[in-house]
């Protein structure tokens, strides 16, 4: 039994489309800029454009851990989420007494909306709140004692609690 093979592309040897008058595959026909009616009608999109289009149509999720998808509708946000954020150490002062304190400023993007805020020092807290961690997990965190001699520039943390509307006096640079 003899098998009838399709036409081969004259340039690369791949299978040519049977109606192509130039006897080329799609890629070679397009790359040589032939005005082939068979390939013009085709809905084929080059691989580099497909992946580029796919990345453009998907929402960015840099602040959401891999495997977690948060779908937000306009005006509706998740009651709670966990994300990574960079915190900058800043000096803040109260309008009432003018006393300077250290705080951390951050900005996060949730569902395309930008949230910016400052975390104020609430004093020492030795008990971790089970609100953010599963009681059965083996997550251990060391509590750091505050030090007035050093203030790190960046800290990565999964917490995103804010006090809005607070002004800060200057950003510490070290």
UniProtKB/Swiss-Prot annotation:
Disulfides per UniProt: none
MF terms in GO: DNA binding; DNA-binding transcription factor activity; metal ion binding
Gene Ontology cellular-component annotations: nucleus
Major location category of this protein: nucleus
Gene inactivation effect: No visible phenotype.
Single Gene Ontology BP annotation: auxin-activated signaling pathway
Residues at which Zn(2+) 2 binds: 9, 25, 29, 36
Keyword Nucleus attributed: yes
Keywords: Activator, Auxin biosynthesis, Auxin signaling pathway, Developmental protein, DNA-binding, Metal-binding, Nucleus, Zinc
InterPro entries listed in its UniProt record: SHI, SHI_C, Znf_LRP1
Subcellular localization: Nucleus
Glycoprotein in keyword set: no
Known DNA-binding region: 9-36
Binding site for Zn(2+) 1: 9, 12, 20, 25
Chain ranges for the short sequence motif Required for homo- and heterodimerization as given in the UniProt record: 110-113
Role of this protein: Transcription activator that binds DNA on 5'-ACTCTAC-3' and promotes auxin homeostasis-regulating gene expression (e.g. YUC genes), as well as genes affecting stamen development, cell expansion and timing of flowering. Synergistically with other SHI-related proteins, regulates gynoecium, stamen and leaf development in a dose-dependent manner, controlling apical-basal patterning. Promotes style and stigma formation, and influences vascular development during gynoecium development. May also have a role in the formation and/or maintenance of the shoot apical meristem (SAM).
Family according to the record: Belongs to the SHI protein family.
PANTHER family (UniProt xref): PROTEIN LATERAL ROOT PRIMORDIUM 1 (PTHR31604), PROTEIN SHI RELATED SEQUENCE 3 (PTHR31604:SF16)
Protein name: Protein SHI RELATED SEQUENCE 3
Source species: Arabidopsis thaliana (Mouse-ear cress)
């Amino acid at each position: 039994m003899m098998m009838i093979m399709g036409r081969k592309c004259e340039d690369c040897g791949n299978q040519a489309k049977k109606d192509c008058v130039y006897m080329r595959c799609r890629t070679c026909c397009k790359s040589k800029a032939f005005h082939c009616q068979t390939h013009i009608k085709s809905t084929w999109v080059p691989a580099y454009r497909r992946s580029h289009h796919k990345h453009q149509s998907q929402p960015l999720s840099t602040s959401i851990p891999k495997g977690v998808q948060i779908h937000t509708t306009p005006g509706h946000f998740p009651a709670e989420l966990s994300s990574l954020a960079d915190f900058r150490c800043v000096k803040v002062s109260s309008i009432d007494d003018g006393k300077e304190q250290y705080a951390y400023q951050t900005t996060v993007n949730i569902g395309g909306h930008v949230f910016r805020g400052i975390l104020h020092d609430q004093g020492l807290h030795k008990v971790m709140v089970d609100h953010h961690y599963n009681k059965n997990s083996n997550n251990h965190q060391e509590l750091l004692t505050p030090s007035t001699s050093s203030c790190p520039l960046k800290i990565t943390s999964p917490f995103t609690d804010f006090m809005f509307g607070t002004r800060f006096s200057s950003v510490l640079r070290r």
